[in-house]
Amino acid sequence: METRKVKETKDGADVKRFRERLKDKKKIVVKIGSSSLQHSETGDLDYTKLDVLVRELCDMRNRGKDVVLVTSGAIAVGKKAVNIKDIKHEEEDNPIAVKQACAAVGQARLMMTYQKIFAEYNQVAAQILMTKNTIVDNLNRYNAHNTFSELFKLGVIPIVNENDTVATYEIEIGDNDTLSAIVAALVDADLLILLSDIDGLYTDDPRQNKNAQFIEVVEELTDELMDMGKASTGSSVGTGGMNTKLIAAKIATSSNIDMIIANSKDIKVLHRILDGKNIGTLFVGNKETYFDLPEFVANMHNN
Ligand SMILES: Nc1ncnc2c1ncn2[C@@H]1O[C@H](COP(=O)(O)OP(=O)(O)O)[C@@H](O)[C@H]1O
Ligand SMILES: N[C@@H](CCC(=O)OP(=O)(O)O)C(=O)O
């Protein structure tokens, strides 16, 4: 049984009020990682999970919300399709090209699967592939923003991933936790939900430290909290571990967007979160900060 650690609110008020306001969120970005989409034993797609994910997203649309899905999985699905088990950097002449080739195969397959399931719920979905330049270049950013706005007006759910085949993978945005927060800031979302292979943020990696305590709410991302993720690596399938989730939290909360990390083992948590239930770790958006998105993305890997 996990020990829950509830951070006191600044004014001592009940943390429940932060959960209550989740009921009113209108524009929601949901991110799912590769490890959550696959069966861990075989690496094949978990269709049951994908089905529940799509159903939850369509139901959010039916509740009148604007919804974006940021999905990983292109490389993992591509690797499976061309029968590559491991991309070992020391054994490949050009490991990045191998990953990019896998992404080219896998992205199309992944979208095919999503399109099929979204169609079952009579929901139109779109694909948006982004690179660092989509945000840094003013005209690109303006066009991307307008495209999202039009898709929302049309009731379409945009499905986003990094354009791994043209991005220099690992030195551009590189992970979808960060990408999802960037997307949330770009579209002026009011909630970002990261579905992970863990319940939320702990005081330390609970897989390494049995005494790690669960943190229910983070009202202020202190340096101490940011350091909590730095040593982490995450699963063998996932890219960023907790570090990239905390970077995402920094981007989101500085843009006044609430963010939640929740466990993807039961994707039905999505509607429960929107019902104000106490699930996952909630990072509270900060109204007082100004966040310069293009500036941040331009300097991302220099920080
Ligand atoms: N402080 C922490 N709190 C929670 N999980 C942590 C922490 N530090 C490291 N981790 C690890 O990060 C993992 C989640 O990252 P990752 O595997 O990249 O997830 P995903 O593929 O879902 O994005 C957890 O399974 C956990 O082992
Ligand atoms: N863009 C890559 C995923 C990168 C990524 O961040 O993966 P993950 O840590 O599983 O969310 C892909 O689609 O394979």
Language model region names:
Residues 2-124, 128-303:
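C-terminal catalytic "cap/lid" subdomain
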